[in-house]
Amino acid sequence: MTKPLPEVSPNTWNFLRDPMITPTGFREYDARWKYPEEINLPGMTALGLGLGTQIHKRGIEPVIAVANDYRDYSLSIKQALILGLMQAGIQVKDIGPALSPMAYFAQFHLDVPAVAMVTASHNPNGWTGVKMGFERPLTHGPDEMAELRDIVLNGDGVARPGGSYEFVDGVKEAYLDDLVGDFKMSRPLKVVCATGNGTASAFAPELFKRMGVEVVESHNEL
């Protein structure tokens, strides 16, 4: 694995080819960077290779559920991450766009040990990041993040055979089914559902309607 550089000049051949990762993006419980100022797509591939190497190092079954939030660049980020995971010999189950809790739900629904959710959470556009874990229902804590950081930044990722990719449809529907269950409103209720044009806009209105709530939608477009 090529050792990532902390900085590469943008709009150059090297920026398109060489992994760049700002070390401070590795935090206690997840990873977060400004994109593309602090991490580039090759850098995200290096992160995937490092995460896959960590999974093998821990002796965990090499299967992972992967998802992304609604940001228009998150799909590219996820695909770069997946490339690194596959390079590390990981079987990838791509569930598409999702909420973070839905990605964690997918670990149990698909019976896979690991998860990686491409999201910058509440950060504004221009940020990206990854929430990850491989000891369900736990996500990475300080020890796991420190180990991952060292693997990635030291260039210790190991390529292995056996990587694969599968797009898994239907997880959103299963997630909503699980949330709603057999719940029904005991009395009529009218609510304004305003998600701020976030990822929840693809879930919340349908969820409330299925519960029997009259929904007034506001700012629910991605």
How would you name each of these model-derived features?
Residues 59-136:
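Ferredoxin-reductase
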Residues 54, 123, 198-200:
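Short, acidic Gly/Pro/Ser/Thr-rich loop/turn segments
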Residues 29, 68, 118, 193-196, ...:
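Active-site flanking residues adjacent to catalytic metal/cofactor-binding acidic residues
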Residues 26, 92, 125, 192-194:
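Short glycine- and Lys/Arg-enriched binding-loop motifs that mark or flank ligand-binding interfaces
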Residues 39, 98, 120, 220-221:
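Residue-level "edge-of-site" marker
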Residues 15, 128-222:
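Gly/Ser/Thr-enriched, mixed-charge loops and adjacent short helices
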